[in-house]
Amino acid sequence: MSFFFIRKIFGSTNKKIIKSFRKIVQQINALETEMQSLSDEELAGKTEEFKQELKNGKTLNDLLVPAFAVVREASRRFLNMRHFDVQLIGGMVLHNGMISEMKTGEGKTLVATLAAYLNSLEGKGVHVVTVNDYLAKRDTEWMSKLYNSLGVSVAFITNNLTDEERKEAYSADIVYSTNNELAFDYLRDNMKFSQEDMVQRGFHYGIVDEVDSILIDEARTPLIISGPVEENNQIYKHINKIVTKLVDSDYEVDEKGRTVFLTEDGISRVEELLRSYNLIPENSSLYDTDSMIMTHYIDQALRAYKLFTADKDYIVKDGKVVIIDEFTGRMMEGRRYSDGLHQALEAKENLEIQHENQTLASVTFQNYFRMYNKLSGMTGTAATEAEEFRDIYRLNVVKIPTNVPVKRVDIDDEIYGTEKEKFNAVLKFIEECYKRLQPVLVGTVSIENSEKLSALLQSHSLKHSVLNARYHEQEAYIIAQAGVPGSITIATNMAGRGTDIQLGGNAEMIAKVELKKIKNADEREKKYQEIVERVKKDKEIAIKAGGLCVVGTERHESRRIDDQLRGRSGRQGDPGLSKFFLSLEDDLMRIFGSDRMRSFLQKVGLKNNEAIHHPWINKALEKAQKKVEARNYDVRKSLLKFDDVINNQRKVIFKQRNNILGNEINDLLEVYSEVNESVVEGIIQSGYYEDYIENIVKEFHTRYGITLDKEDLAKFLNKQEALNYINDKIQEFFTEKEKYFNSQHTTDLWNTIVKQMMIMTLDHLWREHLSVLESLRQSISLRAMGQKDPLNEFKREAFLMFESMLEKWKELTIHRLAHFKLADNQEIGNRLHSARNSRLPKVSRNDKCPCNSGKKYKHCHGAVTVVS
């Protein structure tokens, strides 16, 4: 039963959707005995049976009940896990193209198998999207037993695969991959010179795990494949020295708006310093036409110092500035801030300054995932962003009931006057938990705070584990053991971690580590059973101690991130506890706290080392968070409107590329005709064409090296007759050229050259166009001062520029083809190879590929073969 039918008849309330799906669950349960009676071969044979029924006219909805029953039985046999009724409901939500909100520990990985299997029957591919390579690999290996038992192929894609391996993986029925890999493969495919080199096969159905993290938190970050632009990097070092000499009165910081402004005193001081470095003329001001570029460098340097903090927004690793994801605390290696900000940070940290990049291709997750014919998602926290999911992605959120009621207790926040007092209170609270062997998970918002708290625990001899961007490699194991009695785990933003915290520890993860060195099979089995028993006893101890205790050391801007941290505790009916410790020095309190809240706290009077508990404070904080979320949503919505303009143009360009790669070049005559008419129109802007015959002859000789006969042109009575004559001459010229090339080399050499020339010219102009559009987008807001709508102005100008670019592409392609000279095979091959690779920066074959794939250049774009 589809969601749209439900909404039409009953309305789209969560309760009614769940009620309707429970009826379908009863039908699935009724088939359980029948499925259990089937042999393994008969169960596997159901897949081909379903595919045949689809060919005979049935729909996926018709097959949902038996298909889900088959998956549940296969899971019971081969994974020793039986889908709960609520998991079946979650699978139906996914199949109907909605978001399934399921609490932590409710088995989202298993839920995905239901919708993935059902939709794979169409043979068009299913993408299951995870937040990191570890989860993609883990889930594939874990669920492959189920899929393979039913004759369904499954594969995963990580950043170290070659193009050949990627293409093979994408051909599987079900593919697990990260959002980054999928989107970058899409961009890389649309930079290829042959359809055979492309790895993806379309966007049929996608299931996005941690959907809020990917489609909301990362929505503003475009994925960019870029190449370096040559420029003088010394200027960043000079500007860095200038900014370090400024005092507080020289600038104003707006932390809410994430901007820094120079004051009048600051402008004067900067101008004086710029002159001392000979960066602007002696009598020039900062805002003179010739000097205004310096404001860009100054602005970025000020942002680097006043808005970006080491170990919070970025870390320095191996001599490079590595961005930290503000929502997940993960390092985003390979990504760089644009517009000179990354160079400003490198200058600030006294590192080697890398060249600023030029965008070769880009796409946002918003626009990438909207290409799927059907999209669905899973997360533990989506309800707070339900409006955005509905408006942007047309995805409705359905809250799935838990299999067992949640027993976790959420205690009111405690607020302290200073950060030091807050951390002392956290220390005392952790010590109390430690004494009763209650496992503790502490969430921090930055690496700096996690290491500060770690040092405090060390000074009190409290053994603990730290999980932040610095220790990403050990992430899964650390989190898996966070439920061991007496364990203390510190983690930056728990969003998207993806690994379940089980009370007593994760027996499988422990076994993987402890059994590594044991070769004897009997000894391994004995040791494994010991681990299982140990974990079982530890679970009982942890439960008696109160279950997992989650401690938040600061409220995040987003309620979802706080809820995700809380949600680590109380899985599958386990007991648990959560509590947040705050201070007036926290960012959220300092920047977004209301005047009313500050007034209230002042009246109450905070004494040293004393905390305030009050339900009103929790409500006030939630109100502040809602304001921030609403503002961030407005920003994302506005950015999407602008990006939609670029995205529509991107679709046209990529479609044009694929058309060129996929077809023989039979329509060149039409291109010639359009270009020729454009040339003649450009010459004859008014009056009779015969007055311009001299200019027409001269122009076509310059463009094509073709001599048109003046006397022949003079015979024609109007422009159209002349155009027909010119078109015939141009066609004759290129036909002769094609015959000659093919006779001297391979029979399809000319066709290959035409395709390459059209694509290389298009790619070059598209890159330039993207750069111009970005500049236009950054400056367009000023139009509002002239009572004009910036978005409408952007649409209008972007369209005109796009039309102009396409005309230029046609003209430039014909011009280059006309002047293309015949050379020996080797020279032609080298020329095509050189032109093809001019789009990417020069790198050695063992360096990382500049397309951000993470692979060596020789295994990525350096491995692409050229026509010889």
Curated annotation (Swiss-Prot):
Cofactor(s) the protein needs: Zn(2+)
Cofactor binding note of this UniProt entry: May bind 1 zinc ion per subunit.
Membrane topology field: Peripheral membrane protein
Keyword Nucleus applies: no
The UniProt record lists the keyword Thylakoid: no
SMART domains, sorted: SecA_DEAD, SecA_PP_bind
GO terms, molecular function: ATP binding; metal ion binding; protein-exporting ATPase activity
A cellular component term, taken from the record's GO annotations: plasma membrane
Highest taxon, organism lineage: Bacteria
Binding site for Zn(2+): C849, C851, C860, H861
Residues in the signal sequence: none
Alphabetically ordered keywords of this record: ATP-binding, Cell membrane, Cytoplasm, Membrane, Metal-binding, Nucleotide-binding, Protein transport, Translocase, Translocation, Transport, Zinc
Binding site for ATP: Q87, G105, E106, G107, K108, T109, D500
EC number: 7.4.2.8
Family affiliation: Belongs to the SecA family.
Protein task: Part of the Sec protein translocase complex. Interacts with the SecYEG preprotein conducting channel. Has a central role in coupling the hydrolysis of ATP to the transfer of proteins into and across the cell membrane, serving both as a receptor for the preprotein-SecB complex and as an ATP-driven molecular motor driving the stepwise translocation of polypeptide chains across the membrane.
Subunit-level organization: Monomer and homodimer. Part of the essential Sec protein translocation apparatus which comprises SecA, SecYEG and auxiliary proteins SecDF-YajC and YidC.
Protein name according to UniProt: Protein translocase subunit SecA
Species of the source: Wolbachia pipientis wMel
